[in-house]
């Protein structure tokens, strides 16, 4: 049975697709694992209310998202913490509005990445890890360049795969992605696009 929960946390931000998957952690006491549900949070660019088939889309189907929705909770009224992507993600993972979160713009660093979120920032990832979860992010990060304190591996994210720099995420054929702190070169995209 599908549960639809109305909540005004975050609006879907443009030019961004990230899936935050948080799963129960091994090595915690068995009772705690049973008490902790799996959490899969999908934040997608420009996704309108009726753009998913279980919410009325009839020009194409989204069977995998529909199945996830039928087995869990669906939040249908998310509002962005900011009008631009990095601050919006920062608001989402810190629970703060843009007046308090450190990331207030899409400020870029010279080589690759955005202004880093300080490593002592309390985030949903730290909160979930304190409660026996493993945390993962797949998609666009943009909250700290590689090898900075804002990189996913320094923000309590156990597994990351995707775009560290949001500018590179805007290219259809990116030259590389990141798997944790390892740069993965996409050889097939080399001649199609420049980062």
Task: Give the predicted meaning of each segment.
Residues 6-15:
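Sec-dependent signal peptide recognition
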């Amino acid at each position: 049975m599908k549960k639809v929960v109305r909540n005004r946390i975050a609006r879907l931000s443009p030019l961004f697709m990230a899936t935050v998957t948080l799963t129960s952690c091994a090595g915690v006491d068995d009772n705690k694992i049973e008490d902790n549900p799996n959490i899969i949070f999908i934040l997608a660019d420009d996704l309108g209310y009726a753009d998913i088939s279980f919410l009325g889309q009839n020009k194409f189907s989204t069977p995998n998202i529909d199945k996830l929705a039928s087995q869990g909770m669906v939040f249908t009224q998310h509002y962005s913490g900011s009008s631009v992507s990095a601050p919006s993600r920062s608001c989402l993972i810190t629970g703060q509005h843009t007046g308090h979160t450190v990331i207030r713009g899409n400020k870029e660093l010279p080589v690759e990445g955005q202004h880093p979120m300080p490593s002592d920032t309390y985030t949903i990832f730290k909160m979930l890890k304190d409660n026996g979860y493993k945390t993962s992010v797949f998609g666009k990060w943009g909250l700290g360049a590689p090898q900075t304190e804002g990189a996913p591996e320094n923000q309590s994210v156990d597994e990351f795969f995707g775009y560290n720099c949001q500018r590179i995420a805007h290219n259809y054929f990116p030259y590389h992605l990141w798997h944790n702190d390892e740069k993965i070169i996409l050889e097939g995209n080399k001649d199609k696009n420049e980062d």
